[in-house]
């Protein structure tokens, strides 16, 4: 009986995976796949791994459709991936489905010995032969092919290598692998380097690495409310977060739902509404009669009232006038000053330069570069390969440098606003005299 009591009442919570105290959000081998079981599946996130540090302002930028919103919606469990995971403290959202080294290589289908084997198996019409671990199924093989080669397969099926002694002579490799025959669109030119010829295929050494999975445990997060308490999400459209008959009730909803007493939630509603520039008289008003900017403030007050450690803003300045944009940037800076970690998705590069501690650039579901605003905006390859437009400050510095290399010194000063740039130029001119 005592053992039974110990089991139910004395079990200690274990941290699923150790994580450093300075890490706010850990993303590990994260894939996001839409319509996974369909042939037209979309790999929206492709094997993303990154450790986001605490008490920093991250701006996530990139072309539309690059995976920015998909990434951040995993942070508080709005989306949960079957492949890879997000960790916030001791809470893991997602599945440790280890895709690493499951796509083992591409076989050279133009090798003479391979051609003969293909012909015997009536597979000469297929475009690519890809060697996979036995651990993956067809859907996962399609995901890995698209993720690695940026091309959707039109069709994919497996050759069973177990009984095909000619194709793979090593019995251990034959037992633990399978070959997919993959066809892509005939109009697509897909060049894959480092293909294995027949001899290399026979010399291939396979190290079995099982896929670890806990999806059946983690798809329903037992500590889901705790995750929402830690990570607050401000949507692009505030209407998503306003649905009560009074502003006070809307702001109170999050805290009360997460276990805060009503009396405390009422205090927080008043405090954060005032903090965002709206008086007590707004508390009993309907949120539906507010302007767009006022709705945004109420929605943010509702998130701040939860007192999260992490805040995510999706296009926070969309539809705001310049004064509203300035207020929003100040809210973000205030959040950092209160020891919060902030993530901002935006297409407004002026705000990135003014406020960001670190910039994350995404493209085709991958993080392609990280760095300070100056490291990003002076990377010509990034600017040319994306739709990112440099802020006015950077554009002016570029023009000055074209006219005279002495203005390179402005890059060291790193002004973030037009006013700071003007001050830096005046200071530089004084130094020349």
From Swiss-Prot:
Enzyme class: translocase
A single GO molecular function term of this UniProt record: ATPase-coupled transmembrane transporter activity
Keyword Transferase applies: no
UniProt entry tagged with the keyword Translocase: yes
Disulphide bonds in the chain: none
Membrane topology value: Peripheral membrane protein
Assigned GO CC terms: ATP-binding cassette (ABC) transporter complex
Enzyme Commission designation: 7.-.-.-
Cell location: Cell membrane
UniProt xrefs under Gene3D superfamilies: P-loop containing nucleotide triphosphate hydrolases
Domain ABC transporter: 25-389
Protein residues bound to ATP: 62-69
Keyword entries, A-Z: ATP-binding, Cell membrane, Membrane, Nucleotide-binding, Translocase, Transport
Matches recorded under Pfam families: ABC_tran
InterPro entries on file: AAA+_ATPase, ABC_transporter-like_ATP-bd, ABC_transporter-like_CS, ABC_transpr_CbiO/EcfA_su, ECF_ABC_transporter_ATP-bd, P-loop_NTPase
Function: ATP-binding (A) component of a common energy-coupling factor (ECF) ABC-transporter complex. Unlike classic ABC transporters this ECF transporter provides the energy necessary to transport a number of different substrates.
Subunit structure: Forms a stable energy-coupling factor (ECF) transporter complex composed of 2 membrane-embedded substrate-binding proteins (S component), 2 ATP-binding proteins (A component) and 2 transmembrane proteins (T component).
Family: Belongs to the ABC transporter superfamily. Energy-coupling factor EcfA family.
Protein name: Energy-coupling factor transporter ATP-binding protein EcfA2
Lineage: Bacteria, Bacillati, Mycoplasmatota, Mycoplasmoidales, Mycoplasmoidaceae
